[in-house]
Amino acid sequence: SENIEAIEFLKRVNEIVHSEHAGAITVAEESTTFAGVTKPVAEGGLGFDFKWNLGWMHDTLDYLKEDPINRKYHHNKMTFPSMFQFTEKFMLVYSHDEVVHGKSPMVGKMGSGYWDDKIATLRALYAYMWMWPGKKTLFMGDEIAQGHEWRYDESLEWSLLKYIQHEGVRRVVSDAAKLYLEDPKLA
C-alpha cells in the first residue's frame, strides 16, 4: 500500500525547492519500482530530478565480485539494467554505503586475483560507468582506489597517488569526466 500523505509531501517539497531555488536539484535514493519518481509533479510524478540507479550499482558489483573465469556465466548482470534504463532519469552512484561496515573499499570488490588485476578491473568499471547513460557520482576516495573503507575521522589516502596504479584510476575518472562534459550524448 502507498502512503498517500508521504507521496503528497514529497511532491510539495520538490515543487517548493524547484520554484524557490532555481538550479537546485533533488535526488531520490529509492530502490523500489515505484513509477514516476522523476516525472514532473504536473504529470503525476514525484518531481525529483534524478533517482539513484541502485539496481545498476548492485548488478555491476555482483558481476565484478565473480572470479573473472566465471563472469561469462553472469553477463546478464551487466545487460539487465538496460531494460529499465530509460524508465526514470537515473544517476549512477557508488555511495558511502558501499565502502563502510565491512563491505570493503571499491578495489576490494573487484573479484579475485592480484592487486594490479583488481585495480585494472576498477578502471574498467569506472570507464563503463561513465559511458553508461545518466549522471554519475562517486564517493570520496573511490577516484583514487583508496585501500581501506571510508573512515569519517581520517583524511583520504592521497599518498597513494605516487603509485602508478592509483594514479591510473584517478586519470581514468578524470578523462572519462572530461569526455562526459564534452559529449552531451553521454549525459
Predicted feature locations:
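Catalytic cores of secreted or luminal carbohydrate-active enzymes
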Residues: I164-L186
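Active-site beta-strand/loop architecture of penicillin-binding DD-peptidases
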Residues: L156
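Conserved alpha/beta catalytic core and glycan-binding cleft of carbohydrate-active enzymes
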Residues: E2-Y152, L160, L181-L186
